[in-house]
Amino acid sequence: MVKADMQKRALGRGLSALIPQAGATGAGKGEQAPKAGVLKLPIESIHRDKDQPRTYFDEEKLKELSESIKAQGVLQPILVRKDGDGYRIIAGERRWRASQAAGLKEVPAIVRDVTEVQAFELALVENLQRADLNPIEEAEGYKRLVDEFKLTQEQVSVRVGKERSTVANALRLLALPTDVKGMVADGSLSMGHARALLGVPRLPELQNLAKQVADKKLSVRDTERLVQQSRSSGKKDAGKAAPKQSPQVKALVEELQRRLGTKVRLTERSPGKGTIEVDFFSYDDLDRLLKLLRKE
């Protein structure tokens, strides 16, 4: 129990909390080395984790790392866990790939006894701290913790050392169409651009605006203006001029948004009648809203 608690507290600090400094313990030549130390494991006994958060590796940078490893060796051990007769990577797949390319037969590694969820959390935290994940990979990592491991957004934020709002905003990106998510993943669009584009309700228009923003390299502020113009134009094209809201109604909407912590739209269809729309961005977010409404 103490061991599990120590691992959980260490997650937000990354793998440095779980990996001893190189040289702090003698590196053995085989699995007979002390469990807490650095082992030299056969490279063919180590396998990548198909569910690891990072999916893209820059080939040019891999080549550079491979050349560095040929000259200097692997300076930081990879982190693995036992998997059948071999080992599965928790963190360090890039170093492992580069070591293979460099022709190494063994790599320094540390074996850790962790659960699947702990292994995924460690991989996610390490990639976040190294800024190795693009925004979509980061969002998909959070989503897996929520969907597969049944963590709430609040629990995810604690585990990875991020604000809950950061986790919630990242998850919102997954509502974007595939082609636009691709632009965010390859850096053509930033998180700020993506958040602005989420305000476009019609899918074809969102895709067109995203391409325009990427092609013209517009700033986030310019993108926000473009989205606002698009929304205003769409309302005019529909022939439905939005009725001017009274100060009382505006105040009510602002109060609802403050209490619920999300976007709220109020439409009056006739005096005293209308509809209220409340945005949510995941089942976890919906559950949070329902608890607020039930005053749980």
UniProtKB/Swiss-Prot annotation:
Provenance organism: Myxococcus xanthus (strain DK1622)
Residues the record marks as active site: E93 (proton acceptor)
Family per record: Belongs to the ParB family.
UniProt-reported outcome of changing Q52A: Greatly decreased CTPase activity in the presence of parS, still binds CTP and dimerizes, covers 175 kb segment of chromosomal DNA in vivo, forms larger than wild-type cellular patches, abnormal chromosome partitioning
Region called Disordered, residue ranges: 223-249
Cellular localization per UniProt: Cytoplasm
Source species, domain of life: Bacteria
Protein's name in the database: Chromosome-partitioning protein ParB
Positions of CTP binding: Q52, R54, S68, G73, L75, Q76, G92, E93, R94, R95, E126, N127, R130, A131
Coiled coil: none
Binding-site residues, Mg(2+): E126, N127
GO terms under biological process: chromosome segregation; positive regulation of sporulation resulting in formation of a cellular spore
Stretches the record annotates as ParB/Srx nucleotide-binding domain (NBD): 39-128
GO terms of molecular function: DNA binding; hydrolase activity; nucleotide binding
Catalytic activity: CTP + H2O = CDP + phosphate + H(+)
Regulation of activity: CTPase activity is stimulated by parS DNA.
GO cellular component terms, A-Z: chromosome; cytoplasm
Residue spans binding DNA: 199-221
UniProt site positions, description: May stabilize catalytic product and decrease reverse reaction: Q52
